[in-house]
């Protein structure tokens, strides 16, 4: 009889690129005035109540088999994908659940939206964790709740970052799904069949945060807002690009080129964001992906140094010029002229 290894009680080194757990200023959130956009929130609430994916996340017979046919390298990459995805979904669940509890009295419409989004995130995390059990692994989500460090983000930063996180999640899932529909020989595990409906949850969550941003015009209609939008667009895109550069072999195992995949996802997310953000990044400027490639190369050097050296001081010394190059590339990316998107009509699809 096989035993299940508990991954969440194994210490994990946190970096800027690892999935994080967030908290925010709940008092400030409770004072949000959403009256200018209440009709959209009411419509979104009806969408969440409908729970279109209630019967979607049910494992079928295709899961009931041995996965020993996967080579050890592919299996390790896939399990890491499941673990990171589960951690990210569970992080969303915790944040949304706490927001629903804190806002229940002051803003019941928003509170119920957060509650129903937390339902979706918990469902996703549970489904991913169950998939991990097929490989005799699991995440102790209760232990994870207590043991992980929480990063504080002001509400407006939560809005920007989570809007983009949900929208980029949509484009990641639907891009993989469409690719594997055309090339089923690369579908190494049945969870990918669920991505079409799954990504619609991400899309609806993104629409909710778009509605929050529109209800707070000061977050979209001035110079400060434009600068923050550029910052979060670049942060989310660069984080994904650097992460996926490290894991190109995973994408290769499902028949995708990681760089081409990321370029497609970035372009689509940038286009989606232009419907709500006042600016979009000029991702068609050749230097944009050239600088991202340079960032990915420098980031890989940092990882290799961690693997090669044990002495903390030596590692810091060797890393310093690499950090400077990496920061220089990121600054160059940020300073590339953005594209105004105020003329694009904001719509919720």
UniProtKB/Swiss-Prot annotation:
One of its GO terms (cellular component) is chloroplast. It is an enzyme of class 1 (oxidoreductase). It is found in: Plastid, Chloroplast. GO terms for biological process: light-independent chlorophyll biosynthetic process; photosynthesis. InterPro entries: AcsF, Ferritin-like_SF, Rr_diiron-bd_dom. It catalyses: Mg-protoporphyrin IX 13-monomethyl ester + 3 NADPH + 3 O2 + 2 H(+) = 3,8-divinyl protochlorophyllide a + 3 NADP(+) + 5 H2O. Keywords: Chlorophyll biosynthesis, Chloroplast, Iron, Metal-binding, NADP, Oxidoreductase, Photosynthesis, Plastid. The keyword DNA-binding does not apply. It comes from the Eukaryota. SUPFAM superfamilies: Ferritin-like. Its cofactor is Fe cation. Belongs to the AcsF family. This is Magnesium-protoporphyrin IX monomethyl ester [oxidative] cyclase. It comes from Gracilaria tenuistipitata var. liui (Red alga). The gene is acsF.
């Amino acid at each position: 009889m096989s035993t299940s290894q508990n991954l969440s009680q194994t210490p994990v080194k946190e970096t800027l690129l690892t999935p994080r757990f967030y908290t925010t200023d709940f008092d400030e959130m409770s004072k949000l005035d959403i009256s200018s956009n209440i009709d959209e929130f009411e419509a979104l609430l009806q969408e969440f109540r409908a729970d279109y994916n209630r019967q979607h996340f049910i494992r079928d017979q295709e899961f009931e088999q041995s996965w020993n046919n996967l080579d050890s390298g592919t299996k390790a990459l896939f399990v890491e994908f499941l673990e990171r995805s589960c951690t990210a979904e569970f992080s969303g669940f915790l944040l949304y659940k706490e927001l629903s509890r804190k806002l229940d009295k002051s803003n019941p419409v928003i509170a119920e939206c957060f509650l129903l989004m937390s339902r979706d995130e918990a469902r996703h995390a549970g489904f991913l964790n169950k998939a991990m059990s097929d490989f005799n692994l699991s995440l102790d989500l209760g232990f994870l709740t207590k043991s992980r460090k929480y990063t504080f983000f002001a509400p407006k930063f939560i809005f920007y970052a989570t809007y983009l996180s949900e929208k980029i999640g949509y484009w990641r899932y639907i891009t993989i799904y469409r690719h594997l529909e055309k090339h089923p020989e690369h579908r190494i595990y049945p969870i990918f069949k669920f991505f079409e409906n799954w990504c619609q949850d991400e899309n609806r969550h993104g629409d909710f945060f778009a509605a929050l941003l529109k209800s707070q015009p000061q977050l979209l209609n001035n110079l400060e807002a434009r600068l923050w939008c550029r910052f979060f667009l670049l942060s989310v895109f660069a984080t994904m690009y650097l992460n996926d550069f490290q894991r190109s072999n995973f994408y290769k195992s499902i028949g995708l080129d990681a760089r081409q995949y990321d370029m497609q996802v970035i372009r689509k997310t940038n286009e989606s964001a232009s419907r709500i953000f006042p600016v979009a990044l000029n991702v068609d400027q050749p230097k944009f992906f050239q600088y991202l490639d340079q960032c990915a190369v420098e980031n890989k050097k940092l990882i290799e140094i961690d693997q090669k050296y044990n002495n903390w001081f030596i590692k810091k010394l060797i890393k310093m010029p690499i950090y400077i190059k990496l920061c220089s590339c990121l600054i160059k990316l940020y300073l590339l002229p953005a594209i105004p998107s105020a003329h694009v009509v904001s719509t919720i699809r």
